[in-house]
Amino acid sequence: NVQINNKNVKLYRDISYGKGMPHRKLDIITPADMSNDTKLPVIFWMHGGGFIAGDKQYKNQLLSRIAEQGYIIVNVNYALAPQYKYPTPLVQLNQAVKFVKENKHELPIDFDQVVIGGDSAGAQLTSQYVAMQTNEDLRDEMHFEQQFKPSQIKAAVFFGGFYNMKTVRATEFPRIQLFMKSYTGTSHWET
């Protein structure tokens, strides 16, 4: 496990959420001096790794610096491709959000101040998740249950992701074919 050396935060590691898939663990990082009397905004984060690699623990050091500013961080792991294909990580993010909401009595989370974000593949995943939370037609097409009203999502942070499947191949990003074929199960992933 990657250790975080930050006395200003508390780390609750490897909390199980959901059932039936691997990597269904999340870490929660809170300010060390958090009081249950004051609700704090929450950030849901998903790591990168081209859908085929990566782990939540590698972002905990960075996310701990954000938590010490007065945020509760929920850092979500997800099942990796090629064994688990699209939309498995999105289903898992929805399970993680639902788990945290159902156990909200344990943390002073202000669910009217939600931030959703990720890096690289996690940015792509969370961008699609935010779109599903704010677009009823897309949510219905994907058969997802809405967890947040658009007014509850105060910000989205998409760091280094890709968002337009029709143009991403043209970027010639190294190994994009491997990542996307592993994740979608097809060579024709743009459509």
Predicted regions and their residues:
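Alpha/beta-hydrolase superfamily serine-hydrolase fold, recognizing
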Residues: 1-191
